Amino acid sequence: MQQPAKPFFISIKVKKMSNRVSYKQQTGSHGLKHKLDHISRFIGNTPLLPITGLHQNKDVKIFAKAEWKNLSGSVKARAAFNIIKNAISSGKLTENKILLDATSGNTGIAYAAIGQKLGIKVALCLPENASQERKDILHSLGAEIINTSPFGGTDEAQEKAAELAKDFPKKYFYASQYTNDNNWKAHYYGTAIEIIRELPEISHFVAGLGTTGTFVGTSRRLKEYNPAIQAISLQPDVAIHGLEGWKHLETAIV
């Protein structure tokens, strides 16, 4: 059964997406940066949907940010893009290396979608009990799936990815989304700025916890803007919960 997406509630003005444009195939660092510029047009500035019927107070307004409008279909496109962009800029990721990471699915799909556009191969350590839909999408995007035990969850997948990166440093670029600062910075410099610009009176921000990048980056910047803003995180109440992508922080590796 497909698991529910993480709650991610904010308010933001809907902006019209520019039409897709073609670009010339190029190789090398310059070519990758050119392609990244093109891809960036389809990440961020996602629509805002009003949520009604959850309360009776007319003074309260709740909005859900439609992150599935991002390239690859989730909020994870923001972090994946920022990680890849900075890795290419620093020279750590080239067309001759394979991007490697652990994932429960959504970040992996973002890596694979972006990697396909860039001509960069992607290998993902994925718990064997991840939904078949996610596996099918990853395969269709050309990603290599390295199965890990369903009992170890993404924690074991992280350990496997780190092991492979250590054993084959010339083969892989280990993205390490759980420890990569470019994860939360994608939201600190992107998501949060959008919120502040479009909803200066925001009072609450709510997000689920996986890598914690969305919550940490967005809430950190919002708190700097207005310390009175309440940042609320959601997580499973038990260690064994079966929710793909969610983390029980007391027992998980983050």
Where are these regions (language model features)?
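Short linear sequence motifs
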Residues: 1-2, 16
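Cationic, low-complexity basic patches in intrinsically disordered or flexible, solvent-exposed regions
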Residues: 3-7
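PLP-dependent amino-acid enzyme catalytic core
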Residues: 9-254
